């Protein structure tokens, strides 16, 4: 019987162990998509206690707590941090079989070095005091943890109207050598159907100093913000797409009419929503190309399912799930519309429903080219798929329908400074899979060849892709 989470956790073959320990383990982290608050990095936040750094804003843990019957008061309510922490300690033993059980223990091991005890009610008080003592030390500040985890770059997620003042402050601080770059997230622009669209355009108009009455005005305002983001080191644009829409792009006069209808709070037809969305996204893609940005699309979530809890807690509180809309055809047409004018940027496609894995893995092959290795990527297992089975499925289907060797690898997609252990989790799973191929005679026993492939997937490919 293997010991729980020893140094060879998830590694069952000699080849897998060599690949992980000699090639994957010590590669830096290039975390090209996350939801960290840049203010916490700029101000080098020192966390008061383990609950603050561990449970604050972590909707994965919140969902588990609710499922275990923990009252909301002990999750997002006014209970003390220690009370919330004890509720988590009681819940974790119930999570065996869920990736949260693995993540929780990995997060205690790195960066805290707790390897000799399980997280449960019996050990909770000891772990609380031990970790809290460390959290008061400079090396366990927000920046200290990033350095301890060997992070080289993080890409945050930022609205076009964000000031990016904290990114600028980090950039100007020569004492900190980790790149923290903004990523453009224009969801509130291309989703004209959102109730807050008109209010958002007022904000965009103010920050860009452009009156927005026409489609040309909107592009002018966005162009000023694109240039500002680019000057702040932006490398990527991300798009949350619950629905993938496509329609032939009409004349600009039609787009002006659609925009005017929306500004006057008149209802739009679905076709008009699709025309507007397609026009904005195709135009944005051309602007990304000019700036050599990567375009990311996160496809297929159903958000804010629980309207009662949404009214109480707002978005990103643990009430989202996997959607089942089909979108192969509109996605194909959208990418093709971008590509027709040779204006399709480097692109990463993520699907939330694993049913769509093969579709996405085959779709990316349609638009490769321009002498760019892995120009179009099938993104790592996302959200409900960033667990062992989900990662394995994504890796296997990418390897079978694309080139795994060109994959840009893992990202945290997280709000937590403790989530860098997800890169370790991914690397162990990757090495186990490739090591298994060798042991079964399905790949050559060429450690030098495979080791380079591992290093590329873990770090080098992403570094080169997001230049």
Curated annotation (Swiss-Prot):
Enzyme Commission identifier(s): 5.3.1.12
Family, per entry: Belongs to the metallo-dependent hydrolases superfamily. Uronate isomerase family.
Organism lineage string: Bacteria, Pseudomonadati, Pseudomonadota, Gammaproteobacteria, Pasteurellales
Pathway assignment: Carbohydrate metabolism; pentose and glucuronate interconversion
Pfam families assigned: UxaC
GO biological process, one term: D-glucuronate catabolic process
Enzyme class: isomerase
HAMAP family membership: UxaC
NCBIfam families: PRK02925.1
Protein name per Swiss-Prot or TrEMBL: Uronate isomerase
One annotated GO molecular function: glucuronate isomerase activity
Top-rank taxon: Bacteria
The keyword Isomerase is assigned to this record: yes
Catalytic activity: D-glucuronate = D-fructuronate; aldehydo-D-galacturonate = keto-D-tagaturonate
Record keywords: Isomerase
Organism: Haemophilus influenzae (strain 86-028NP)
InterPro entries documented for this protein: Metal_Hydrolase (IPR032466), Uronate_isomerase (IPR003766)
């Amino acid at each position: 019987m293997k010991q729980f989470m020893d140094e060879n956790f998830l590694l069952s073959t000699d080849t897998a162990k060599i690949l992980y320990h000699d090639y994957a383990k010590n590669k830096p982290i290039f975390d090209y998509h996350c939801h960290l608050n840049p203010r916490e990095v700029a101000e080098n936040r020192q966390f008061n206690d383990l609950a603050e750094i561990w449970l604050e804003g972590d909707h994965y843990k919140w969902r588990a707590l609710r499922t275990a019957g923990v009252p909301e008061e002990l999750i997002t309510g006014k209970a003390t941090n220690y009370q919330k922490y004890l509720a988590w300690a009681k819940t974790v033993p119930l999570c065996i079989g869920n990736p949260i059980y693995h993540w929780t223990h990995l997060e205690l091991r790195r960066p805290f070095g707790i390897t000799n005890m399980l997280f449960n009610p019996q050990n909770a008080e000891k772990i609380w005091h031990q970790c809290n003592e460390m959290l008061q030390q400079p090396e366990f500040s927000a920046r200290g943890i990033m350095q301890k985890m060997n992070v080289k770059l993080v890409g945050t997620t930022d609205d076009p109207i964000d000031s990016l003042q904290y990114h600028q402050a980090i950039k100007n601080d020569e004492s900190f050598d980790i790149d923290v770059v903004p990523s453009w997230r224009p969801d509130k622009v291309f989703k004209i159907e959102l109730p807050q669209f008109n209010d958002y355009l007022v904000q965009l108009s103010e920050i860009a100093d452009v009156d927005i009455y026409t489609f040309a005005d909107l592009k002018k305002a966005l162009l000023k913000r694109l240039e500002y983001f680019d000057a702040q080191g932006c490398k990527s644009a991300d798009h949350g797409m619950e629905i993938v829409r496509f329609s032939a792009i009409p004349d600009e006069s039609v787009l002006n009419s659609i925009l005017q209808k929306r500004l006057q709070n008149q209802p739009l037809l679905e076709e008009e929503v699709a025309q507007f969305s397609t026009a904005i996204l195709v135009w944005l893609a051309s602007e990304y190309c000019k700036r050599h940005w990567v375009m990311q699309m996160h496809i297929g979530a159903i958000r804010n399912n629980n309207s009662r809890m949404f009214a109480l807690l707002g978005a990103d509180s643990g009430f989202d799930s996997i959607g089942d809309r089909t979108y192969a055809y509109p996605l194909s047409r959208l990418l093709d519309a971008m590509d027709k004018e040779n204006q399709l940027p480097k692109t990463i496609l993520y699907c939330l429903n694993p049913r769509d894995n093969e579709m996405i893995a085959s779709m990316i092959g349609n638009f490769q080219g321009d002498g760019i290795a892995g120009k179009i990527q099938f993104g790592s297992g996302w959200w409900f798929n960033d667990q062992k089975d989900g990662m394995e499925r994504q890796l296997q289907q990418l390897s079978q329908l694309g080139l795994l060797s060109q994959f840009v690898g893992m990202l945290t997609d997280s709000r937590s400074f403790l989530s860098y252990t997800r890169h370790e989790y991914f690397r162990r799973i990757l090495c186990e899979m490739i090591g298994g191929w060798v042991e079964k005679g399905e790949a050559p026993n060429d450690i030098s060849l495979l080791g380079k492939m591992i290093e590329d997937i873990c770090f080098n490919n992403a570094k080169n892709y997001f230049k």
